[in-house]
Amino acid sequence: AVLAGRNATVDGSVLLAHNEDDSGEQMPNIYNVPRNDAAGTNKYLWIEFPGMAVSDGYLNEYGVAVVSDACNSREDREDFTDGGVLYEVRTLVAQKARSARHAVELIGELVEERGYRGSGRTYVVADPYEGWVCALVKGRHWVAQRVPDDMVMTIPNYYCINEVNLADTANFMGSPDI
């Protein structure tokens, strides 16, 4: 993924680009996901989304876009509630997030409450005003960094947040025990 802050682009737009590098001849799709505030849901080990042949990227009515890149982690403390979360994170974020910051808060809540069951992943979220990179490892640990308005960041399927200052809440978020 590539994320450019609004002062790093000619027209002042926040730009998010992502290519899917899965094997085979795959054409990634982007979906406009309507708002959904469901009172309850069913639990599945694997989730299929009705009407979606594949699930690559999402954009909602508030202009919040979310994509993800696999990142291998060495976290060995598997800690899940109700099977943890995995592929459904993008859909849940697209259904509820009103901003990129809100998307990161939702991801953090999901990881802290349920645990992330994949090896690791970086979610990249953007709205018309800002972009964030949110890194997860297996279990309940996550960290996120706001991409500065004058910066372009590339996320090449490995973790790229280097230094974290959780006291700087305008630019960082994460698990309390990071």
Enumerate the predicted regions with their spans.
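Cysteine-dependent hydrolase recognition
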Residues: 94, 100, 118
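Aromatic- and Gly/Pro-rich donor/ligand-binding loops
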Residues: 103
